[in-house]
């Protein structure tokens, strides 16, 4: 009797949870992404630019370069980073787990495809999408679905493709769209197939969600703190390290990066390591091409620079098996080399 009564009492209030989640998603994305990018698209169309390269004018002193880059970077992404942590924690307490299991929890290709589709409105950079992917994994979303969502956010970002068309040309945007779609779907599918789920990866899933552990605010507070502590400190540290190394990763000297296979490989690998805000690959490539970089290394960089980064891979170390993250990073680099290599042939 008691169990039946509690079940009946709980049922009528469940609708507000997903409703609140989607309200936060829509309001947050409108404020952080959709409305600013709408105006930025007109700027890109009129000026054929969306701003200066975030890598320009690196200080020779590594410590100063690290601080300068961290300041510029975090000023650009802090709103999206906060939104990512909020959504990554809310998805653990507001979205019924069986909803996620029916859509993104499947290990078949359907889960990967849905993860890709759900990523399109997000338009987040790889580091801001990482907390959301981590929250999804805590809800037992499959590796394929979570990886597709994580990579699809920056790689298939509709706003970035529009900016790219106006700034670099629609040929670049078309290549990024087609190659990016193949890259996201193929890598997520292969990682799902080749990497076995481990008990260590699945263990955290059961601890945050049950109603018996307290009310909404207490459970959300625990989820928020756990997600913040497991992602943000290492994120900040990794950004500082890469900020110090940027002058060596991306040489801007005239003619330094020519149209050769060596530079295709170098740019593909550097792009997998470095961290940038959303769409920052466009002015980076624009500046480097004006300095003499060839089309093939440019395409390699356009594929890998937004897709993954060392900080985002580290942020997801507790959400995915290590093998899954290594494979993802390696296959993104290979994808960049393939796209750049094909450009050398044609």
UniProtKB/Swiss-Prot annotation:
Domain of life: Bacteria
Subcellular location: Cell membrane
Transmembrane regions: 12-32, 71-91, 113-133, 146-166, 167-187, 223-243, 260-280, 296-316, 326-346
Entry keyword set: Cell membrane, Membrane, Transmembrane, Transmembrane helix
GO cellular component: a single term: plasma membrane
Membrane topology (UniProt): Multi-pass membrane protein
InterPro entries in UniProt: DUF318
Main location: membrane
Pfam families hit by this protein: ArsP_1
PANTHER family in the cross-refs: UPF0718 PROTEIN YRAQ
Family the entry assigns: Belongs to the UPF0718 family.
The protein's name: UPF0718 protein YraQ
Species of origin: Escherichia coli (strain K12)
Gene expressing this chain: yraQ
């Amino acid at each position: 009797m008691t169990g039946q009564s509690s079940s009946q009492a709980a049922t009528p209030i469940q609708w507000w949870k997903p409703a609140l989640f989607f309200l936060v998603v829509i309001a947050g994305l409108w404020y952080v992404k959709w409305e600013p990018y709408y105006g930025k698209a007109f700027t890109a169309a009129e000026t054929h630019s969306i701003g200066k390269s975030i890598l320009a004018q690196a200080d020779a002193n590594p410590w100063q370069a690290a601080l300068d880059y961290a300041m510029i970077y975090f000023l650009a992404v802090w709103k999206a980073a906060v939104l990512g942590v909020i959504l990554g924690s809310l998805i653990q307490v507001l979205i019924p787990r069986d909803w996620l299991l029916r859509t993104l929890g499947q290990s078949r290709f359907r889960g990967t495809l849905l993860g890709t589709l759900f990523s399109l409105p997000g338009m987040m950079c790889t580091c801001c999408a990482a907390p959301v992917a981590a929250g999804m994994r805590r809800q037992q979303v499959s590796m394929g679905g979570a990886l597709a969502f994580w990579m699809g956010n920056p790689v298939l970002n509709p706003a970035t493709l529009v900016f790219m068309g106006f700034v670099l040309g629609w040929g670049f945007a078309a290549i990024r769209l087609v190659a990016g779609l193949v890259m996201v779907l193929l890598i997520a599918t292969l990682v799902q197939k080749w990497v076995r789920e481990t008990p260590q990866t699945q263990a955290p899933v059961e601890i945050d969600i049950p109603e018996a552990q307290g009310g909404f605010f207490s459970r959300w507070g625990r989820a928020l703190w756990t997600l913040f502590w497991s992602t943000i400190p290492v994120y900040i540290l990794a950004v500082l390290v890469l900020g110090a190394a940027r002058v060596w990763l991306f040489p801007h000297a005239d003619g330094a990066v020519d149209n050769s296979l060596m530079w295709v490989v170098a740019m593909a690998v550097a792009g997998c390591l470095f961290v940038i805000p959303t769409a920052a690959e466009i002015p980076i490539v624009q500046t480097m091409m004006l300095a003499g970089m060839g089309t093939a290394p440019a395409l390699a960089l356009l594929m890998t620079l937004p897709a993954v980064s060392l900080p985002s891979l580290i942020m997801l170390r507790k959400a995915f098996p290590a093998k899954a993250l290594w494979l993802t990073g390696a296959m993104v680099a290979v994808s960049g080399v393939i796209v750049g290599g094909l450009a050398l042939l044609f």
